[in-house]
Swiss-Prot record:
Pathway: Alkaloid biosynthesis. It is an enzyme of class 1 (oxidoreductase). 2-oxoglutarate-dependent dioxygenase; part of the gene cluster that mediates the biosynthesis of paraherquamide, a fungal indole alkaloid that belongs to a family of natural products containing a characteristic bicyclo[2.2.2]diazaoctane core. The first steps in the biosynthesis of paraherquamide is the production of the beta-methyl-proline precursor from L-isoleucine. They require oxidation of a terminally hydroxylated L-isoleucine to the corresponding aldehyde by enzymes which have still to be identified. The gene is phqC. This is 2-oxoglutarate-dependent dioxygenase phqC. Its cofactor is Fe(2+). 2-oxoglutarate binds at residue 302. It comes from the Eukaryota. The keyword Oxidoreductase applies.
Amino acid sequence: MSKTTEVKVVEVQLEDPLPGIVDASRFISGSPTEQRAFAVELVDSVRRCGFVKVINHGLSDELIDELFAWCQSSHVVQNERFFAIDPEQKLAVVNPPGPSPQRGWSCVGAEKASRLFSRGQTSLDLTDARRNQEHFDAGSPSDTKWPSRWPDEAVIPGFKAFLEDFYVRSHQAALLILEALEMGLNLPAGVLKSRCGGCASELRLNNYPEIDIEELRRGKISRIHPHADLGVITCLFQDGLGGLELEHRSHAGSFLPVPPGARSEMVVNISETFQLWTNNVITAGIHQVTVPPEMKTRTEGRISARRSCAFFLKANGDASVAPLPQFVTQERPAAYSEMTALDYHQKRLATAY
């Protein structure tokens, strides 16, 4: 039997709390030296702050423009925009609240992400806070156990076909990032990818309706309260409004803006399953969505609607979320017990409703 290689734990210097920007073309088509350099930079950024920005990952500006056209809530071109369709059409594909994988439409306030922090990861008392967010979730086109809930084709022609294609493209891009993380952490090739090749991942379109600043400042409703995602990694595309913030690793409870960049810039954050696999060597990126930076000093007025799209790369349901042996030593014993990814996900998601 081959000997398990221990991963060296590096003490992280946190002088720069913001995510780095890495060019994935170096990993896609670069030399072995360039691939290694990309992987090291990728790991350095997520180790520091739980986040990294990725460019030239294979999803074009034009494709992301088309993606955001489907996310609009304006009624100008209603049959091309999901969030503008009639409420009864959304209710026809509503996501049933509960711990099963999310499929279909969730209304504003349906999910309480703040409850995901009930394990003491934050000191904020937000257990009943609600989200000013509606979203549409789709699973893998090949998922027959939990099939996606699609609006009738006559209601929004082409919506299903586009999102199913975008799901496949996003999954490929996310697996590329995971492959680079394997390399940057000196793990055996495929040890993480092999756990994420199934149909457990999810694609989410987000719409944050226009809202008064005063309402957000009262604290019982937020665009998204502080939380960590439950999967392996999240690949996010955001519009130009801003409001996404990550927690400063050296100052718990303090948050820093993650401003939008180029149209196709992909913001990648480490999620809880990755933290479990690495036995807390790489920890999940805590984040929130709040008032855009340029409006922070205002006490009144309205914040425009915000849109984003997240691809949640998740482990196969039967994959273990226990720490990999490469991250377990006598000095760093396993911090998490054996559990399947599906059981872990359902246990955690049940707290959000």
